[in-house]
Amino acid sequence: MTDCLEKRIDRITILTGAGVSAESGLNTFRDSGGLWEGYDPLDIATVGALDSNRDMVLDFYNSRRSQLKDCLPNLSHLAISNFQNNFSGHVFLITQNVDDLHERAGSPQVLHMHGSLRSMRCD
């Protein structure tokens, strides 16, 4: 399979979303009991939210960081990491997730479309 892929494909892009990390036990945004339940996204996830609802925003994201500490990468994260490492330089991973489970699984490069819980910047 390696020879076949290397001869035919120069680059592969993988896009992941909430379903990948849900298998590790992370809550998603829209499911029943999801992260938005009880919150208006405009009160939590906008640039102005930090100014107008600082404590609520920090509590929301700190709670998510706390939940993430107890989660481990699952078989999907590991398979993607293995694929990336076997085809080094040919597989580009983009995730809509803000967790670091791809990195913990060993993925060498991950582009986080919506930022990362691992880094926080308040301007």
Residue ranges of model-derived segments:
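Conserved catalytic core of sirtuin-type NAD+-dependent deacylases
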Residues: 1-123
